[in-house]
Amino acid sequence: MRTNPTTSGPAVSTLDEKNLGRIAQIIGPVLDVVFPPGKMPNIYNALVVKGRDTVGQQINVTCEVQQLLGNNRVRAVAMSATDGLTRGMEVIDTGAPLSVPVGGATLGRIFNVLGEPVDNLGPVDTRTTSPIHRSGPAFIQLDTKFSIFETGIKVVDLLAPYRRGGKIGLFGGAGVGKTVLIMELINNIAKAHGGVSVFGGVGERTREGNDLYMEMKESGVINEKNIAESKVALVYGQMNEPPGARMRVGLTALTMAEYFRDVNEQDVLLFIDNIFRFVQAGSEVSALLGRMPSAVGYQPTLSTEMGSLQERITSTKEGSITSIQAVYVPADDLTDPAPATTFAHLDATTVLSRGLAAKGIYPAVDPLDSTSTMLQPGIVGEEHYETAQKVKQTLQRYKELQDIIAILGLDELSEEDRLTVARARKIERFLSQPFFVAEVFTGSPGKYVGLAETVRGFQLILSGELDSLPEQAFYLVGNIDEATAKAMNLEGEKK
């Protein structure tokens, strides 16, 4: 952590005292730079190329040292386009890794990989910056207690609970509600935990990044009138950027999240969309640096790169970083090295189902496919564990009976199976709930449901106490008391 000078004057004068090198070779986004003997920059140091191109346009390219080649040469990867650079141009060694702004001033703003704001709202009002490269917390600093991270979303808390300081994989195609689920989690952590969120858009579509920003402004997650009251900082490295930027933008987002955890001692939610693009960018850089490819053409350092990012995402005694990572599975092949390496780090998986979204059940989280290492009686307690297992058994039996129902109809089922189907349909509907961030679209107020309330509600459905209530009473409500009240209203309307 360091504090920058408030004016640009002293910062510029210190650059004059830095090592100066010259570009010797340019291959796409990779530069070879020659430095004077004995003045070689360190690995990961940031280099800056400033000057003008052939038509007089200003050039300002930041690179990161990746290899020391010998003969006073270093090889660096550019964080922006290298158009207009020529051999012989002057290169300044900043003497330190890339540093980005951190702290409360980053909330409500959009940054690129270098920590520069790209939302046209002026400079960031902070003097504190932090280098993007650092080691994970020391073993003694880690918080080893297993604790549940309550999200207020029934289906998640009951069937695939998140671990405080854990890592969650979010699997889902286009249009099943990933963005809405992400925004609801950002909103809920701010309300229930007093925490903040950092969103890292790694190699995503520019349009999606823009849509997310606009939706966050609409739903109040980003407060336009008072930026300081926003609950999220956004860091984007889009698909059109060089591989260096896409490879490092995850670390930029993580560095901002670490400050909230270590200095502000807050619970932080870190979103990475998409973790596969981080691996993909690393693969491109690896090839450009001339490394021998490994399995399926991936970089030989795949596990190391993934580990260096993931091991920094953890709980310490000060606070926690809970990470939710969207995972793209190439060609639906779960044995591909990229998703396979990611799975090794995940504590829970939340799978979104197109079938549930088509039924209008939101959040469209698949209760049978989603998993969590936290769903153990020793961690969540016997009562929660038993309830979750019974819910899954009921839904699984309903799934098995669906073919019979489709062919023969409900009447051909045994009394016991008909009861199971009726309860399963109530459970399926009760797993839906209205979201705060969707209020502007649905008109129904959002609901945050505590874990104890969630468990109590499903116990009542499973016990048979609510068998007489119509299933539509359980659709898009918060806790079980709202469902019974809704059932009474429906009865009243019929009369």
Swiss-Prot record:
It comes from the Eukaryota. Its EC number is 7.1.2.2. It is a peripheral membrane protein. Pfam families: ATP-synt_ab, ATP-synt_ab_N, ATP-synt_VA_C. The keyword Cell inner membrane does not apply. GO terms for biological process: proton motive force-driven mitochondrial ATP synthesis. One of its GO terms (cellular component) is chloroplast thylakoid membrane. SMART domains: AAA. It is found in: Plastid, Chloroplast thylakoid membrane. One of its GO terms (molecular function) is ATP binding. It catalyses: ATP + H2O + 4 H(+)(in) = ADP + phosphate + 5 H(+)(out). Gene3D superfamilies: 2.40.10.170, Bovine Mitochondrial F1-atpase, Atp Synthase Beta Chain, Chain D, domain 3 (1.10.1140.10), P-loop containing nucleotide triphosphate hydrolases (3.40.50.300). InterPro entries: AAA+_ATPase (IPR003593), ATP-synt_VA_C (IPR055190), ATP_synth_F1_bsu (IPR005722), ATPase_a/bsu_AS (IPR020003), ATPase_alpha/beta_chains (IPR050053), ATPase_F1/V1/A1_a/bsu_N (IPR004100), ATPase_F1/V1/A1_a/bsu_N_sf (IPR036121), ATPase_F1/V1/A1_a/bsu_nucl-bd (IPR000194). ATP binds at G172, G173, A174, G175, V176, G177, K178, T179. Keywords: ATP synthesis, ATP-binding, CF(1), Chloroplast, Hydrogen ion transport, Ion transport, Membrane, Nucleotide-binding, Plastid, Thylakoid, Translocase, Transport. Disulfide bonds: none annotated. It is an enzyme of class 7 (translocase). Belongs to the ATPase alpha/beta chains family. F-type ATPases have 2 components, CF(1) - the catalytic core - and CF(0) - the membrane proton channel. CF(1) has five subunits: alpha(3), beta(3), gamma(1), delta(1), epsilon(1). CF(0) has four main subunits: a(1), b(1), b'(1) and c(9-12). Produces ATP from ADP in the presence of a proton gradient across the membrane. The catalytic sites are hosted primarily by the beta subunits. This is ATP synthase subunit beta, chloroplastic. It comes from Convallaria majalis.
